[in-house]
């Protein structure tokens, strides 16, 4: 790594820290939504087992009106087992009560349930009746079309189950789920019959209620990467409950492409097939625990004078995997944070991830994939590195003349700058020639940081001593925390620090002052501190990038030189250039 790379990467570290700490958009709490939660009631039946407020018998008619009869019933569970997940549906609310992914384990390498609200379920229809009753369908019992308790699916096999709630003659709510054996997406259809004029403004909401359960060991990292969001008008609306003492709310009108709630590596999303009226997002911290709870809802309107109205959606609960999300063709991959949309995101989506996909077809070892990727990047950037090294070699060769010039014109800065420009021009040297190649690589380096920080492909992938390339490769837990360093010792950053030192040592430099000598030691230490708490995959990449840089520098030093510099002389102070007489004699 040359000196300009040193400066560039120092800037990368500083900008990343500032960006992560201070540049996240602030979410301001907004007023309560018009639909208030049902409160102040007592639990009445042990078999209801709800996370939503249950109601005392005497309060049922007052609370639920014509829906009162549906508040009593027997909960019937249905387990759907396909190649990717095991889901549990409940007839109480016709909701999703459990979702366990088969290909992704938690930090203890165990299967885990993504649904936080496992008692009440995650999905609900929420509306207010004309007589002022607030209805959450998770408080109501539906009748399932199938009495099976378990259904297994593989390949393209599909299964449909219908949940029906009869409110009155010719007045009902029907919810239909359709599962397929080899996909994460679940078709979700809701149908209202006889509800025209029953709801104020004919409005209702379809909600995902509750954040996803965390799966990672580093809870602070989970908190940083958890939020609710909506995709509207080609832009991402994001609500992050960053302050646990506040409750955040956001409502917007308009057509939404989707709503979603995510953790670091997993996401739950509702994707409508017809235009919506708006979205509602809510987020807050959980008292006494490190968890951010979120609600995301789509707003719909029942058309007037329409006896039966249906909405079709896709429910997606699965990994934050770029290829999986992109395959849905609804821009759900926009939920992935790749930094600036105008700079680093194109590098991530169109260069880094496609190369990773290609390499993953050659080997399933992601440690090897990272090493090969680092080698490819060095080969691609070789012309830039060569240009940078040659420029610095020329600058180094000019140093004696630069020092002489500075001494000669120390009292005449204007003349000194003029002479510097002349010398650079005659030598064919651009003072910025060493910096420009590094600056051109900055977007790629930034994009690498974001991809390696968020890529689920590295999660729980081991390499050498690193048990998980998405976590620091800790070889020793200290039991206490060192400021700026952390509570553990990671090996890749130590090796990388050594490689950075060696790379600086063998790289030609145009300066040999004490400050640059100090950087030989300061920068490796800075890199050690910065990378100790970053994913091992990122540390491995930069380690190998520097190892290949060392080999590349040895080769360039051996095959190139600054001997082709033209002969350049300094003007003697106070002496004008001499003219020649005719005949070749000097005047």
UniProtKB/Swiss-Prot annotation:
The gene is yidC. Residues 577-587 have a biased composition (Basic residues). It is a multi-pass membrane protein. The chain crosses the membrane at residues 5-25, 338-358, 367-387, 432-452, 482-502, 520-540. Residues 567-587 are annotated as: Disordered. One of its GO terms (biological process) is protein insertion into membrane. Keywords: Cell inner membrane, Cell membrane, Chaperone, Membrane, Protein transport, Transmembrane, Transmembrane helix, Transport. Its main location: membrane. The keyword Transport applies. InterPro entries: Membr_insert_YidC, Membr_insert_YidC_N, YidC/ALB3/OXA1/COX18, YidC/Oxa/ALB_C, YidC_ALB_C, YidC_periplasmic_sf. Belongs to the OXA1/ALB3/YidC family. Type 1 subfamily. Required for the insertion and/or proper folding and/or complex formation of integral membrane proteins into the membrane. Involved in integration of membrane proteins that insert both dependently and independently of the Sec translocase complex, as well as at least some lipoproteins. Aids folding of multispanning membrane proteins. The lineage of its organism: Bacteria, Pseudomonadati, Chlorobiota, Chlorobiia, Chlorobiales. It is found in: Cell inner membrane. HAMAP family: YidC_type1 (MF_01810). Gene3D superfamilies: 2.70.98.90. CDD domains: 5TM_YidC_Alb3, EcYidC-like_peri. This is Membrane protein insertase YidC. NCBIfam families: yidC_nterm (TIGR03593), yidC_oxa1_cterm (TIGR03592). Interacts with the Sec translocase complex via SecD. Specifically interacts with transmembrane segments of nascent integral membrane proteins during membrane integration. It holds the Pfam family YidC_periplas. GO terms for molecular function: membrane insertase activity. GO terms for cellular component: plasma membrane.
């Amino acid at each position: 790594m040359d000196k300009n790379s040193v400066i560039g990467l120092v800037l990368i570290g500083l900008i990343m820290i500032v960006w992560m700490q201070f540049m996240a958009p602030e979410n301001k709490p907004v007023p309560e939504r018009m639909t208030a939660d049902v409160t102040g009631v007592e639990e009445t039946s042990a078999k209801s087992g709800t996370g939503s407020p249950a109601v005392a018998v005497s309060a049922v008619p007052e609370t639920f009106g014509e829906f009162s009869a549906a508040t009593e019933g027997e909960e019937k569970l249905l387990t759907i087992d396909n190649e990717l997940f095991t889901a549990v549906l409940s007839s109480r609310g016709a909701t999703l009560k459990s979702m366990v992914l088969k290909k992704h384990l938690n930090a203890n390498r165990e299967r885990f349930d993504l649904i936080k609200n496992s008692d009440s379920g995650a999905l609900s229809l929420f509306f207010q009746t004309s007589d002022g009753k607030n209805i959450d369908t998770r408080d109501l019992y539906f009748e399932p079309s199938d009495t099976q308790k378990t259904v297994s699916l593989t390949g393209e096999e599909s299964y449909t189950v219908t949940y029906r709630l009869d409110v009155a003659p010719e007045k009902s709510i029907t919810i239909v789920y359709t599962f397929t054996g080899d996909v994460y997406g679940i078709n979700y259809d809701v149908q209202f019959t006889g509800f025209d004029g029953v709801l104020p403004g004919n409005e209702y909401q379809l909600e995902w209620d509750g954040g996803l359960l965390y799966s990672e060991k580093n809870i602070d990292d989970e908190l940083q990467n958890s939020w609710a969001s909506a995709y509207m008008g080609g832009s991402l609306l994001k609500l992050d409950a960053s302050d646990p003492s506040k409750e955040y709310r956001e409502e917007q009108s308009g057509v939404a492409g989707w709503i979603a709630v995510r953790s670091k590596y997993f996401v739950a999303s509702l994707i409508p097939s017809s235009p919506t009226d708006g979205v509602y997002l809510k987020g807050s911290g959980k008292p006494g625990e490190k968890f951010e709870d979120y609600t995301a809802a789509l707003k719909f309107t029942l058309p007037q004078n329409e006896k039966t109205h249906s909405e079709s959606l896709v429910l997606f609960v699965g990994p934050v995997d770029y290829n999986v999300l992109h395959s849905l063709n609804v821009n759900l991959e926009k939920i992935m944070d790749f930094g600036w949309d105008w700079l680093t995101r194109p590098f991530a989506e169109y260069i880094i991830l496609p190369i990773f996909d290609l390499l993953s077809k050659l080997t399933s070892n992601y440690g090897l994939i990272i090493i090969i990727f680092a080698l490819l990047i060095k080969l691609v950037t070789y012309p830039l590195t060569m240009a940078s090294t040659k420029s610095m070699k020329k600058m180094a060769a000019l140093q004696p003349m630069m020092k002489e010039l500075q001494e000669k014109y120390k009292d005449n800065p204007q003349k000194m700058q003029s002479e510097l420009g002349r010398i650079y021009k005659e030598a064919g040297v651009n003072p910025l020639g060493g910096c420009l190649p590094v600056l051109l690589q900055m977007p790629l380096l930034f994009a690498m940081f974001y991809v390696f920080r968020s890529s689920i492909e590295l999660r729980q992938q081991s390499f050498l001593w690193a048990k998980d390339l998405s976590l620091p490769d800790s070889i020793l837990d200290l039991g206490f925390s060192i400021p700026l360093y952390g509570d553990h010792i990671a090996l890749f950053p130590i090796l990388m620090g050594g490689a950075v030192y060696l790379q600086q040592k063998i790289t030609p430099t145009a300066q040999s002052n004490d400050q640059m000598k100090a950087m030989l030691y300061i920068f490796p230490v800075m890199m050690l501190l910065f990378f100790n708490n970053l994913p091992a995959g990122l540390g491995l990449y930069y380690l190998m990038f520097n190892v290949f840089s060392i080999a590349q520098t040895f080769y360039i030093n051996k095959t190139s030189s600054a001997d082709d510099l033209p002969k350049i002389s300094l003007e003697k102070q106070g002496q004008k250039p001499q003219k020649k007489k005719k005949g070749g004699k000097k005047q």
